[in-house]
Amino acid sequence: MSTEFVFVDHQAAQASVRQKPKLSRRRGACENCKRRKVRCSGANPCEQCLKVNVHCWYIGNNQSRRRSVPNSGADKNNQQGDTDRHNGARLGLESFGHLHFFSESFLDAQSIPMDQPPGSSPVMDFDPYDYDASPLSMSNEQTALIDWDQLEATSNYVALGISANSGNNFIADQCFSETRTATNRASKDPLNGGCHNTLHTGEFTHDSRTVDELLNDSIPLAFAASTKSSLSFDYVRSSLHSWLLTAMTELDGDENRHILQTFERLLNANSPVIRHPSLNEDVNSIEILNSLRSESSQNRALVYRCIDACFSNPNRVGIFLDRMTVEELVCQVLAHPFVSSPISIALCLSFLAVGSRDLSLDDDCREMNAMNLFRTALYIRPNPSSGPSLWTFQALLLMAHFSCDIGAESTTSLMTDTATCVQALRLHSSAAISNLCSSDSERVNLKRAFWTFFAVEKLHCIQEGLFPLIHGEYADHKVAAPQDPLCRRYDCLYSDVGYAKICSKILQQLQGQQDISQVGSSCCGRESYKQSPAFTANRLETMLMEWKGNLPFDGDGKNIFTATSPGERRIRLTCINMYHFAMIAIHSLPGVEDTDASKRQRCESAREILDMSEHITSADLLYDWSVPPLCPDC
C-alpha cells in the first residue's frame, strides 16, 4: 500500500513559526542580570534581580517604554508586593498621627536656601511616602530608618535656609550672624587643625567623623565657641528634638516609653538626652531644657541673673573661667540644647545651679531649682576615660567645686574624675599647658584652674579623712597672677593654695605616709630619728601662724566686722574660720590629741568658730561657698 507524501509550503511554515512568542533579548532588557529570556516591565525589577537582591538597571537603560502594564504573572506579583510594603509603611507612620509632634508652623518656619533658584520648592517640601522622591534614603535596618549621615553632611547647608526668627530660637538673631562669621573664621584658623566643618556659599564638605567625636576633641580653655558653633546650630534637628520631646512630656508613661524607643531608633545616639536608659531622668532633663529655652516665661532674665551672680565675686568662678566664653556657651546650649554635647549641657546647668543657689531661686522658680539643675548635670556628666579634654576638665572642676560646697555624696567621685583629667592632660607641666592653649590668657586660666582643684581637693580630703591624689610638689609652675584688675588687690587663690599645702602636711601625718619633722638620714649606717608628736604639732602650728600672718588684713577676729564692703567682710570671715578649723585638725593628730594643751586649744578654736557663727547671715552662706562647710551650725 503506497503512502502519500505531503509537502509543506514555505509560507505556511513561516506562519507557524510566527505563532510562537519570541523570548530573545530585546531593547530594554535588564542590564544587570543579562537574562535574554526575561522581560522587565519597566516599573518593577525583573524576577532574577529580586532573587539575588540586586538593583535592577532596567529603568536607567530602557530605550523603549511603550508598555506601562505588567506583561507576566511574576510582574503582577512583584508590583502587588511593592504596593503592600508601601501601604504598610504608610500605616506605620499614620499610627502616630494623634500625637501631634510638630506644630502647624513647622513648614511655614522654613525658607529657601540662599543658593536655591527662585520658584523652587523649600528644602523640607517632599512626600514622606514617596520613596523615589524623598531626599533621604530609607532602610529597614534596626537603627537606620533614616540615613542621618546624609543629613549630617547637609546640616550646615540646610541650617542657612531656616529662618532666624523662629519662635523656638533663643537669641537667634544674635547667634545667627555670629555663626556664619565664626565658621568662616574657623575654617581659616591654622590653630584648629583646619576645621573639618568648612562652610562656603553653594558647597559643603562632609566630615567622616561623627558629631560626638568632633565635640569631644581637645579644645582650648575658652571652649572654642567660635570653632564649634556650626555644630551646635543645626536648626532643623534642634527643632525636631524640641517639638517631639515637648509633646512627650504631655503623654502618660506607656506612650512616653513607646515614643522614646521609636525616636531613639530614628536619632541613633545623636542626642545626649535619649542616650541613657532611665526614662524618668530623660523626661526630667527634657522638662528642664525646654523650660529654660522657653520665650514665654521670664527664664531668660533669670539666666542672665544667674551668670551675674556667678561672676559677681571675681575670686570664685572667675578664678579659672572667662565670663565672655561662659555667656556664649550658655546662649548656644539654651538656643539648641538637643544638638549640644553632654559636656556643654552639664557645664551650662552647673553654672545655672551655682547662680540659682546664690540668688535663692528654689522657691520662686521651679525650673531654676539649684538641686534639680545640678542633678541633671550630674546625670549627663562627661566620662574622662572616654577621652579627656580641657572642656571635660572645666565641667568636672565646676561640678566638683559645687558638690563639695553643698556636701553632696557625689563629691568624692567627681574629685576622682577631675584628678583623672589632670593626670591625662599633664596639667602639672608648663610645657603641656603651652601645647594645649593657644594664647597667654588661656594658659593663665588653665594654671589657675589646676591650683583651684589642688586647693578644693585638700579641703575635701581633710574633712572626709581621705588621701589626696594631686600633689603640688610635682608641679613646675606656680599660681599665676589673675588677669582681672579687681582680683589683683587681693587674690584668694594664693591664700587657698597656702592653706591647702598645710592641709596636705596634716594629711601626711594622719595617713602615716611621711613625718615632716623627721631629722637626720640613714646614710653611714646611722638610723634616722624622729621628734616627738608634740614637736610635729608645734611645727604645723607655726606654719599655720605664718599663713595667717600673710593675710592682707588683721587675722585677729575682733575687728573682722569693720570691713569696708560685704565682700571683704565675708573673705575675712572665711579665712578666720579656716584658721581655727586647721588648728583643731592639728591638735587632733595621734600622739597629741589626749594632752591637756591640745584639748584646751581645740576648745578655744571651737569657741571662736561659735562666736563667728553668730554674725553669719543667710546672705553670707549663699554668697560665699567656703563658709557653710566650716560653720558647725550648718
Curated annotation (Swiss-Prot):
UniProt region (Disordered), positions on chain: 66-89
DNA-binding region range list: 30-56
Subcellular location: Nucleus
Biased composition (Polar residues): 69-81
GO MF annotations, alphabetized: DNA binding; DNA-binding transcription factor activity, RNA polymerase II-specific; zinc ion binding
Gene Ontology annotations of biological process type: DNA-templated transcription
Misc remark: Gene clusters encoding host-selective toxins (HSTs) are localized on conditionally dispensable chromosomes (CDCs), also called supernumerary chromosomes, where they are present in multiple copies. The CDCs are not essential for saprophytic growth but controls host-selective pathogenicity.
Functional summary from the UniProt entry: Transcription factor that regulates the expression of the gene cluster that mediates the biosynthesis of AAL-toxins, sphinganine-analog mycotoxins responsible for Alternaria stem canker on tomato by the tomato pathotype.
Protein name: AAl-toxin cluster-specific transcription factor ALT13
